[in-house]
Amino acid sequence: MPASSSKGQYLEVGGQQVPITSPDKVVFPDIGVTKMDLMRYYVAVAEGALRGVRDRPMILKRFVKGITEEAVFQKRAPEKRPDFVDAAELKYASGTSAKEAVIHDAAGLVWAVNMGCVDLNPHPVRADDLAHPDELRVDLDPMPGVQWRQIVDVAFVAREVLEDHGLTAWPKTSGSRGFHIYARIQRRWPFKFVRLAAQSVAREVERRAPELATARWWKEEREGVFVDFNQNAFDRTVASAYSVRATPD
């Protein structure tokens, strides 16, 4: 249960006092899940969840009015934030920049939920080296009518392609409709090269399973499961492992 002080309500997490607001606010109206329920969930899965978000800059995807309203994507971390939440400055090709939130522990997870986040969306880089990703990400995006079995079959093909090139593929079921596959890589290559590598993976998956998968860029040309390589672009984030997705079911 949250405690109270002269400064308002807070939740004790890992020795940190996390300021919270409106813990009883309903986030998922169909099933009655509240903000406090989400906080408890992320504390319970913190060990696993932090493997995907710790020390990484992340966009705050805020459902300030619950999942029935559109999310607000906030790149800039609030100026007023707890000491246990850091920020890393990302500079974009447009010439703009943003200091994005970086969390390190379970208290940071609770802070993100209190900000209105349902899912967590980190970049594939760590705060100490923003130019070189340490993850290659493959997003399997099913076209309408595609069944789950086909997505899984494509995932196995993608795993084979990655393993043929010396990479270990990890499945991640935190996609809203499809499937994510991650491979950890050395922090040696810039985003451009990592994206090109992911594009090559996608094309090879299509070559090996043309009846199941596509790497076609234009939506009207796609059939089956789209092997989305563009999630490796500099400005892209993907929902992390153990993320709750903002869907009614």
Predicted regions, residues:
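Helical (often loop-to-helix) elements that flank the catalytic cores of nucleotide-handling enzymes
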Residues: 31, 73, 79-95, 147-165, ...
